Amino acid sequence: MAGQLAAVLGTGQTKYTTKRQDVSMNGLVREAIDRALADSGSTFDDIDAVVVGKAPDFFEGVMMPELFMADAMGATGKPLIRVHTAGSVGGSTAVVAASLVQSGRYRRVLAMAWEKQSESNAMWGLSIPVPFTKPVGAGAGGYFAPHVRAYIRRSGAPTHIGAMVAVKDRLNGAKNPLAHLHQPDITLDKVMASQMLWDPIRFDETCPSSDGAC
């Protein structure tokens, strides 16, 4: 069965917002999972493995939350894989889940990514002191900005490539009623006029701190 095709059978999302004080972390992820199972016509019994995407644990202040949340995610007695690739964790989670199906190892995989940043403080979580980070005081943006500049230099991409991506993403987000931000009038000029944070990254290229699961 190696090399078999992978497909999305169903999806489920919560409303993304600054604070979801009406649910716990378990309740938040279960809300999205229940919707995905209903959309796919599946039950937990149909799931062979669970892949959970989660960025830094400091965003919620709970280390390895996937372990105590296993019951809520229907992962009891099943393989549970944690994916953490920082800002790309949402896409990486889908890639890992698809690869498990394509390899023939599992038939149905539940992929779920989430954050509940209101439980902690994202600015603190991205600016933690030693021994967790090198004592340079750069923060997440300070580490990523040189990579963006290097990409622009190597590829010949325009210096405003990040702003172009932000406009595309904001316009797509405006079509999703569950999205945190709705900016249907966003333009390249508006993004370029926003505050410079870490050259060449501007404020309107960054994401909000959100509670949500998918």
What residues fall within each predicted segment?
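Hydrophobic or amphipathic alpha-helical targeting/insertion segments
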Residues: A98-M112
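Glycine-rich anion/phosphate-binding loops
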Residues: G27, S88-S92
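Conserved "HGTGT" condensation-loop signature of ketosynthase/thiolase-family condensing enzymes
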Residues: M1-R82, S103, A113-C214
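Conserved phosphate-binding catalytic cores of ATP/NTP-utilizing and phosphoryl-transfer enzymes
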Residues: G91-S99
